[in-house]
């Protein structure tokens, strides 16, 4: 029998037919392995036929969530779908919701979570491709391909710059999508009325954000959770581009202060709390909000 044993949701590994919940795991020292339940949201494209599958396995102190997923896929369930690449928090591809919070699976230690059941879900705000993997294209659609890179004319006129780090794409952003998932406006959990062009709220007789969101999704099935808001990651990228290229101010502010830009931010600050790289996108959004110019339509 393999170390990882799949069970039905809520069933005990020892007696899967009983239907009783897993017995509590006794506290152990950090040096000891523990047997935990990993509860994974499974679904097809678009989140179809969503369900939770439980896997019981022994977890070592050094095991990350990604390590455990790899073991489940290799030893127990090769159909499990998730995204991973670098395994050291550089690529951002393994971002997911772990016990209800956006985290990187590769650097989240299982035992450090302190729960006997670890629940894994895909990021919100982005279309689900299958199980824990989401489609990042709606986020990247609002980030121009050349933002954050040196353009040929700059290289020819300035040569190699001092401090190459400032030319790194989006600075410390690893484009993981955690901020998009955590943002209540983007993920659909904020039901405050949408902002008007002047930044004020709609009256009680106007549609709520939820109603407007549903209308947008009815007309475009590929639309993200809140089709009106481009989200914190694109706005953070836009603010970085503004700092690098002040000559493009009007062009960029037309996007940032336009109908899908900063006016939809409700300052929940969830995006900054979720960021694993300390980018603090909420500050970038507020920087754009304080600027003058750009689109007002």
Task: Report residues per predicted region.
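Iron-sulfur-associated redox domains of electron-transfer enzymes in respiratory
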Residues: 2-140, 164, 180, 184, ...
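Ferredoxin-type iron-sulfur electron-transfer modules in oxidoreductases and energy-metabolism complexes
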Residues: 63-78, 121-297
């Amino acid at each position: 029998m393999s170390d990882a044993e799949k069970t039905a949701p809520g069933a005990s590994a020892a007696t899967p037919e009983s239907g009783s919940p897993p017995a509590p795991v006794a506290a152990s020292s950090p040096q000891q392995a523990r047997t935990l339940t990993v509860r994974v949201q499974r679904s097809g494209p678009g989140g179809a036929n969503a369900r939770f599958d439980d896997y019981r396995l022994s977890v070592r102190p050094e095991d990350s969530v990604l390590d455990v997923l790899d073991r489940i896929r290799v030893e127990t369930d090769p159909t499990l779908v998730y995204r991973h690449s670098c395994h050291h928090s550089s690529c951002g591809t393994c971002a997911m919701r772990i016990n209800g919070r956006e985290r990187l699976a590769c650097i989240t230690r299982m035992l450090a979570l302190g729960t006997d059941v670890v629940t894994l879900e895909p990021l919100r705000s982005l279309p689900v491709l299958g199980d824990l993997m989401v489609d990042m294209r709606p986020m990247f659609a609002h980030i121009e391909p050349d933002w954050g890179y040196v353009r040929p004319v700059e290289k020819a006129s300035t040569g190699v710059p001092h401090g190459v780090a400032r030319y790194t794409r989006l600075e410390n952003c690893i484009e993981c999508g955690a901020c998009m998932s955590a943002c209540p406006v983007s993920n659909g959990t904020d039901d405050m009325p949408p902002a008007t062009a002047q930044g004020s709220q709609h009256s009680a007789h106007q549609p709520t954000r939820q109603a407007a969101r549903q209308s947008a999704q009815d007309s475009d099935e590929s639309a993200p959770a809140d089709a009106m808001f481009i989200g914190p990651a694109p706005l953070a990228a836009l603010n970085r581009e503004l700092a690098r290229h002040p000559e493009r101010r009007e062009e960029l502010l037309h996007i940032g202060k336009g109908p899908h830009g900063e006016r939809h931010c409700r300052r929940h600050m969830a995006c900054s709390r979720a960021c694993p790289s300390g980018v603090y996108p909420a500050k970038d959004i507020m920087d754009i909000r304080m600027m003058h110019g750009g689109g007002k339509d």
